Amino acid sequence: MIHPDTTLRFIDDEIGFGVFATRKIPRGTITWALDKFDQVLSPEVKESLDPIHLEIVDKYSYKNRKGEYVLCWDFGRYVNHSFNSNCLSTGYEFEIAIRDIEPGEELTNDYGYLNLEEP
């Protein structure tokens, strides 16, 4: 579940949507956590999907440390990549703010820490 003090905003045609803070989110705050509404798919289930659903999973999911694909039910799926990210995945199904995130600032994550082929 994405932090409640966020909103979804269209950025542009190339990037699409992003998640933005509506209030200050202090450093160390949990910004996203896996919850029961998120879909967790095994690689076998993912590969059995029809092309339309497979495209959605490929675009919006990430691979967890078990090699499963996690598809967020809320707009947590729209957190964009940045090499200078303000959020960090812990590897334990939640993310934290690694610095203060100001109102109007986009929440970002460094995708380099996600979707690793090997733990």
Q: Where are each of the predicted segments found?
A:
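Conserved catalytic SET/PR domain of SAM-dependent protein methyltransferases, capturing the structural core
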Residues: M1-P119
